[in-house]
Every structure is written in structure tokens, then in C-alpha cells.
Design a protein with these regions (language model features):
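Surface-exposed, polar helix/loop patches in the mature regions of secreted/periplasmic/lumenal proteins
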Residues: 101-139
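N-terminal pre-ligand scaffold of iron-sulfur
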Residues: 31-107, 120-121, 140-155
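Mature extracytoplasmic/luminal segments of secretory-pathway proteins
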Residues: 15, 25, 89, 97, ...
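A sequence/structural signal for flexible, mid-protein segments enriched
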Residues: 29-32, 112
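Short regulatory "switch" loops immediately downstream of catalytic or recognition motifs
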Residues: 1-2, 93, 127
Length: 155
């Protein structure tokens, strides 16, 4: 093995390393995700049995149901499609919880009673933002996993 081959090989490895490090440093971003200041984090886990008649609406795509016992103002469960379920906080995310901040279900939407903000249950996004408000938050999403006939909802 000659010396020029070793030098060329080492130079290629150094160049690869420099390119990789440049990519890593350029990829870093100081902008962080803005956490919703109105609704603090909650710690919970519960399950529901989809075989019970109470949860029949969740057996169909687009079906939704409000469960009042968890979350700030309850949790909305939504059947996105056959095996994909979503769980959303039922409290309007754009102000402190109060007497009118619980959202109401409107088919595949939920609406904040205070400002009539409407949110998609498929994405959690605000559908009718107000031009005067600068910080508008989506619904808070909770985790859902399927275990047999049970949905386990957690945060």
C-alpha cells in the first residue's frame, strides 16, 4: 500500500466528517415548540372497552365521544379510521379554563362555547382563527393505544 493512497483515503474521511458536522450544526434550531400556557400537563391513563354499548359510536369512522372523567374539561375520543383513534383535550386551548371553555361536539368538529372557535377532530387544528389574536393553539392531543378490544388513553 503506498503512502499517497493512505493520505487520499484519510483526506476523504476527514471531508466526510466535516460535511456531516456541518449538516448537524446547520440542522440545529434554537426555536422551540411553544407550549400552551393555558393548559398545564396532566398525568393520567385509563382504558375503555369498545365492546360496551356506551362506546358504540367509536366503532365507526368519524365517530366521536366525550369522556368527562379525565383531562381538564374532559377528553374527546375520535375514530379517524378503522384502527386509528385520537384523543383530544375538551377544554378550549386558547384561554384559561372557565365556565364556558368546555368544547361541544359537532360531528367531526368540536367548538369552543366562549368564542365559537371550531377545531378539526382529525387534526386538532383551529379552523376559524380570529385575525385579532396572535397566539392561537391547536387542541391538546393525548396518546391512544389499542389492546385487543380496549383503548388505552394516556398522557
Amino acid at each position: 500500500m503506498n503512502l499517497s493512497y493512505i493520505v487520499a483515503s484519510s483526506f476523504k474521511n476527514i471531508m466526510k466528517f466535516c460535511v456531516l458536522m456541518t449538516y448537524i450544526f446547520v440542522s440545529c434550531n434554537k426555536n422551540s415548540v411553544t407550549r400552551n400556557p393555558f393548559l398545564p400537563e396532566l398525568d393520567f391513563e385509563f382504558s375503555i372497552n369498545l365492546n360496551l354499548p356506551l362506546y358504540d359510536n367509536l366503532k365507526f369512522t368519524g365517530g366521536s365521544l366525550l369522556i368527562n372523567d379525565f383531562g381538564h374539561k374532559g377528553i374527546i375520543l375520535y375514530n379517524l379510521n378503522y384502527n386509528n383513534y385520537l384523543a383530544w383535550e375538551a377544554s378550549c386551548p386558547n384561554h384559561n379554563p372557565n365556565s364556558c371553555s368546555k368544547t361541544k361536539l359537532l360531528g367531526v368538529l368540536t367548538e369552543c362555547v366562549c368564542e365559537n372557535y371550531q377545531y378539526s377532530l382529525a387534526t386538532g387544528q383551529l379552523l376559524n382563527p380570529s385575525p385579532k389574536d396572535t397566539n392561537q393553539y391547536p387542541l391538546i392531543n393525548y396518546g391512544v393505544r389499542i389492546s385487543g378490544n380496549n383503548l388505552i388513553i394516556y398522557n
